[in-house]
């Protein structure tokens, strides 16, 4: 799904969607799909009916993720198609409050995913904050003459492991989606995501936004 938007808020959403799409494809190719987007998801009618359709869904939003999870548990074959003809275009939320509400709704979909499957995303969200605490907490002056360079290089490598992969992921995703890529824009979106994603994840545990007239 390609997200088209204007300004800083639109760019953040566009880059975020490209990264999430690539994560969805990666987990699908690994045989453990974590995310799904109903805007361009297709399934066989027979498989859908065999699993009872959407019966049993307890939340107003998330039917796409819940269905994919049921398909996976039933041993159905699930695939991803990274092809321009499969791209669906959507508009970014034009307001900050709208974007926050949308992300609260998306995060709420994780209720349908097993706790074991959520461990890696949770580590991913908390990794930079733990790394920041470690970086700030080190008594750097005391390390002068005592393996200062080694500690600095190890931390630099740890930060590089966090910083480098996602912009490259966004670049590849935007190429598939036919969208222009900017390193600065991707970096800004990555920084913003690092700040708001943990807050959204925690808030989604207690906040249930209204969507299509119902609380999700």
Question: PLM features: residue spans?
Answer:
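Short secondary-structure boundary/capping segments
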Residues: 32-33, 78-79, 208
């Amino acid at each position: 799904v390609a997200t088209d938007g204007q300004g800083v808020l639109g760019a953040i959403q566009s880059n975020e969607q490209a990264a999430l799409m690539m994560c969805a494809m990666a987990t699908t190719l690994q045989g453990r799909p974590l995310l799904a987007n109903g805007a361009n998801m297709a399934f066989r009618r027979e498989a859908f009916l065999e699993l009872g359709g959407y019966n049993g869904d307890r939340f107003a939003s998330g039917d796409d993720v819940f269905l994919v999870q049921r398909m996976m548990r039933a041993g159905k074959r699930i695939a991803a198609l990274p092809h321009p003809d499969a791209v669906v275009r959507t508009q970014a939320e034009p307001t900050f409050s709208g974007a926050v509400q949308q992300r609260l709704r998306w995060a709420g979909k994780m209720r349908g995913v097993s706790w074991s499957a959520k461990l890696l995303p949770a580590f991913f969200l908390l990794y930079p904050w733990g790394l920041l605490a470690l970086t700030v907490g080190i008594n750097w002056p005391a390390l002068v003459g005592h393996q200062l360079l080694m500690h600095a290089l190890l931390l630099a490598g740890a930060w590089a492991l966090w910083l480098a992969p996602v912009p490259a992921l966004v670049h590849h995703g935007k190429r598939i989606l036919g969208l222009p890529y900017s390193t600065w824009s991707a970096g800004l979106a990555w920084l913003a995501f690092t700040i708001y994603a943990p807050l959204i994840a925690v808030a989604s545990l207690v906040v249930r936004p209204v969507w299509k007239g119902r609380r999700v």
